[in-house]
Amino acid sequence: MTNEPRSVLRVEHAVADYETWKREGFDRDPIGRAEHGVRSFRVLRSGQNPALVAIELEFDSLPAAEAFAEKLREMWREVGDRFGWRELPEARLFELAAVQEY
C-alpha cells in the first residue's frame, strides 16, 4: 500500500440467494471494477445472517469512489427486482485511516 490516502466504498445489503447474487451479479462485474479505478475488493458475509453481504471496494481517490458509487446506484435501480431486493443496497464512502496486518 502506498502512503497516499485511499478511499473505500462500502456496500451492505441482503441478498435472497448468495450464490446466485455472487455468480450472476458480482462475479459478472457488469460495470467494470478495474476500468473504473477499483484497486481491490473484499466480499464479506455476516456470521449471524449469511444473506447479509458487505463489499469493500478500494480506490486511489474519493472522486473515483464517488463516480463508481453513482454507477452502482444506477445499476441497482435496474436489477433490484431480479435479485429479490426489498430495498436498494446502501453505499457509504470512507477514507482509509489505518491498516495493520499481523
Q: What is each PLM-predicted segment?
A:
Residues 6-14, 42-71:
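Short, well-ordered beta-strand segments in beta-rich or mixed alpha/beta enzyme
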Residues 19-21, 63-65, 99:
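Residue-level signal for secondary-structure boundary sites
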Residues 23-26, 36, 56-58, 67-70, ...:
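Surface-exposed beta-strand edges and their flanking turn/coil or helix-capping segments
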Residues 1-5, 36-54, 77-102:
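Glycine-rich beta-strand-turn "strand-cap" elements at beta-sheet edges
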